[in-house]
């Protein structure tokens, strides 16, 4: 008689079977946090800390602020995915999010959102200071309640006021270092506030059909390209002007000043190019996406310059 040995239930095979499943689940949870958004938010955090310190803060403070800020942004993103799961399935851009595909259940997403938010506040409170923790809580509240629940489905100005949540990282960073919120932090807050519309509206022009299908009144989806391009140009000019306030009111030096002028001029050129194209085309997709990607490059360059600035020469005014 021949003995048959089954290997389907051995611990090794069980481990192999569970491994990919665990990896998929972890990846799904990560996707809930909108990591690309977190990356963009963190671009502003460390440079602001360096500028506030006029040098490098302690490694412990940097880690606490970056991790706490990332967790706060991730919590807000996960709450957003939970609340918007009904419209995400209607949009090609978001139809593969974990709550739409079923990789994560609504209950799991909600618990994850709360845990991540609680961890963020605790890390900022004990790793930095209570002020930065309160600002982190304010950022989560603003994105989840003000933007996602109240504004997003009701007004074409949703991203203008709701986008203020994305400005909080500079306040958190400044508060973590100085335990206060001063004029340079407020100016940087306003730069990102004014940057948000010319960043997102070109994207909503490109994916206008998605937003219309989901009945989300994003300006780029419900207004014509001519109207949207005018708004993009106006906000771009206001943003560049605001960025230059760091020179008289924020103690900025030559590195920041030159970068703000040159990068600002380049982004204004791209914004005006979108406007010119919009006068001839109903949906200037390629030019709109060029402005979208250009806005990311602009903000990255500006904050890199902010980080380098304290190490290279005195302030332009009063130095």
From Swiss-Prot:
Record-annotated membrane-spanning stretches: 59-79, 108-128, 131-151, 158-178, 183-203, 232-252, 254-274, 299-319
EC number: 2.5.1.141
GO cellular component: plasma membrane
Keyword NADP: no
Pathway field: Porphyrin-containing compound metabolism; heme O biosynthesis; heme O from protoheme: step 1/1
UniProt KW keywords: Cell membrane, Heme biosynthesis, Membrane, Transferase, Transmembrane, Transmembrane helix
A biological process from GO: heme O biosynthetic process
InterPro entries cross-referenced by the UniProt entry: Protohaem_IX_farnesylTrfase (IPR006369), UbiA_prenyltransferase (IPR000537), UbiA_prenylTrfase_CS (IPR030470), UbiA_sf (IPR044878)
Any one GO molecular function term: protoheme IX farnesyltransferase activity
Protein's UniProt keywords contain Lipid biosynthesis: no
Main location class: membrane
Family matches, as Gene3D superfamilies: UbiA prenyltransferase
Protein localization: Cell membrane
Membrane-topology descriptor: Multi-pass membrane protein
Reaction(s) catalysed (UniProt annotation): heme b + (2E,6E)-farnesyl diphosphate + H2O = Fe(II)-heme o + diphosphate
UniProt function note: Converts heme B (protoheme IX) to heme O by substitution of the vinyl group on carbon 2 of heme B porphyrin ring with a hydroxyethyl farnesyl side group.
Family: Belongs to the UbiA prenyltransferase family. Protoheme IX farnesyltransferase subfamily.
Additional notes on this entry: Carbon 2 of the heme B porphyrin ring is defined according to the Fischer nomenclature.
HAMAP family attached to this UniProt entry: CyoE_CtaB
Name this polypeptide is given: Protoheme IX farnesyltransferase
Organism: Pseudarthrobacter chlorophenolicus (strain ATCC 700700 / DSM 12829 / CIP 107037 / JCM 12360 / KCTC 9906 / NCIMB 13794 / A6)
Gene, per the UniProt record: ctaB
């Amino acid at each position: 008689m021949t003995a048959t040995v089954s290997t389907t239930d051995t611990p090794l095979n069980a481990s192999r079977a569970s491994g990919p499943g665990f990896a998929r689940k972890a990846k799904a949870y990560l996707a809930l946090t909108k990591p690309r958004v977190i990356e963009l938010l963190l671009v502003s955090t460390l440079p602001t800390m360096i500028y506030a310190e006029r040098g490098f803060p302690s490694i412990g403070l940097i880690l606490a602020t970056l991790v706490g800020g990332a967790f706060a942004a991730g919590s807000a993103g996960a709450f957003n995915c939970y609340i918007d799961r009904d419209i995400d399935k209607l949009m090609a851009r978001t139809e593969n999010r974990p709550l739409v595909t079923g990789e994560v259940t609504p209950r799991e997403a909600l618990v994850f959102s709360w845990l991540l938010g609680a961890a963020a506040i605790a890390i900022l409170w004990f790793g930095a200071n209570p002020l930065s923790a309160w600002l982190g809580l304010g950022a989560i509240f603003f994105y989840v309640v003000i933007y996602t629940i109240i504004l997003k489905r009701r007004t074409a100005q949703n991203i203008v006021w709701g986008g203020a949540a994305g400005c909080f990282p500079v306040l958190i960073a400044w508060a973590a270092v100085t335990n206060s919120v001063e004029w340079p932090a407020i100016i940087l807050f306003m730069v990102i506030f004014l940057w948000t519309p010319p960043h997102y509206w070109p994207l909503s022009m490109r994916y206008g059909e998605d937003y219309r299908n989901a009945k989300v009144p994003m300006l780029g989806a419900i207004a014509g390209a001519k109207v949207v391009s005018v708004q993009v140009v106006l906000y771009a000019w206001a943003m560049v002007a605001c960025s230059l306030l760091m020179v008289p009111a924020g103690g900025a030096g030559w590195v920041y000043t030159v970068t703000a002028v040159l990068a600002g001029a380049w982004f204004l050129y791209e914004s005006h190019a979108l406007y010119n194209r919009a006068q001839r085309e109903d949906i200037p997709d390629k030019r709109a996406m060029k402005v979208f990607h250009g806005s990311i490059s602009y903000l990255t360059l500006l904050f890199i310059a902010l980080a380098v600035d304290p190490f290279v020469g005195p302030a332009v005014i009063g130095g």
